């Protein structure tokens, strides 16, 4: 089940043309193909669907859906049970620190981020006492090498994912004085058992979830 508009895992190699490729290969194998359009959303209000139609056609709200409200450039004032979505992780980390500084309870969905970020730090050094300035110089040299390699191989989505990881680690580096401190900050932000009043999440992790108020 899927369509050309659902390649939300592009950073993992998802292809928006995957369904088309399946269809082509099945037809070449003399298989009969049937299409069953799923163009009605039972989850989104009409105003949200109307906004989505600017980018995705043939997508409709259920006739009983509430009208809802889309506010462009709304003030960032999320409250309890609100959801904050972003395509990448780094802006979520910044938003997390911003909300915490305001005394609000927030969490970033996806504890699986912890291992990847910690490993990216440990890949550079196992010395937890190393200062952040020295660490950052070594980290950036490694980043630039691997980023250039991905670009040369035309792996754009993977390069963007690497950029996002770099931006995340940059934020944590600014919050610490040593490598050990960076790792502690990563674990503090992501190892909170997904508990809090305001949920921050990347779009792909939030698939299937809903909230009355969503900031994008």
Which sequence ranges carry the predicted segments?
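Short, intrinsically disordered/low-complexity patches at protein termini
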Residues: 72-74, 131
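Terminal export/targeting leaders at protein ends
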Residues: 78-80
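Core RecA-like ATPase module of SF1/SF2 helicases and allied nucleic-acid translocases
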Residues: 86-216
